[in-house]
């Protein structure tokens, strides 16, 4: 994994992986990942999935992993790779006419808001979070 992502994007130390456990799990069931992987591109995601498949290791994906009520970024099978898409945080396109934004999965509400303001957009953004939550994660959670 380090060859595919760089050592700084493969977390294996317990302190570095603390955000990827479920703090509300029953005692002894922390749902600890085997490693946290932080890809920064589609190609890196593909490489991670290829390697995980070759080794039969389950992958648990999250965009920000902040939804603590649902276990956050914690995998349901201990030892799984926690695949965090946080580094994929670019706003790729904003279509003013159709009121649409194309974003990578790690884009937070803060990121989209800042992009709209910096670009001079006239679009107004309704934010269902304090700002650090995931645009994509929130949309998927609510069936958009």
Whereabouts are the PLM-identified features?
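Extended, alpha-helix-rich binding/interface surfaces that flank or overlap catalytic cores
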Residues: 106
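N-terminal flexible segment immediately upstream of the FAD-binding catalytic core
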Residues: 1-50, 54, 66-99, 128, ...
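Short active-site loop/helix that positions an aromatic residue
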Residues: 111-118
């Amino acid at each position: 994994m380090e060859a595919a992502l760089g050592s700084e994007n493969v977390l294996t130390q317990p302190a570095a992986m603390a955000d990827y456990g479920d703090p509300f799990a029953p005692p002894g069931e922390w749902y600890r990942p085997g490693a946290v992987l932080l890809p920064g591109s589609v190609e890196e995601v593909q490489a991670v999935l290829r390697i995980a498949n070759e080794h039969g290791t389950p992958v648990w994906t999250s965009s920000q992993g902040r939804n603590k009520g649902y276990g956050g970024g914690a995998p349901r099978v201990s030892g799984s790779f926690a695949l965090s898409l946080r580094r994929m945080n670019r706003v790729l396109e904003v279509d003013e006419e159709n009121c649409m934004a194309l974003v990578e999965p790690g884009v937070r509400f803060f990121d989209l808001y800042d992009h709209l303001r910096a670009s001079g957009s006239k679009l107004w953004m309704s934010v269902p979070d304090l700002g650090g939550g995931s645009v994509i994660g929130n949309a998927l959670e609510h069936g958009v």
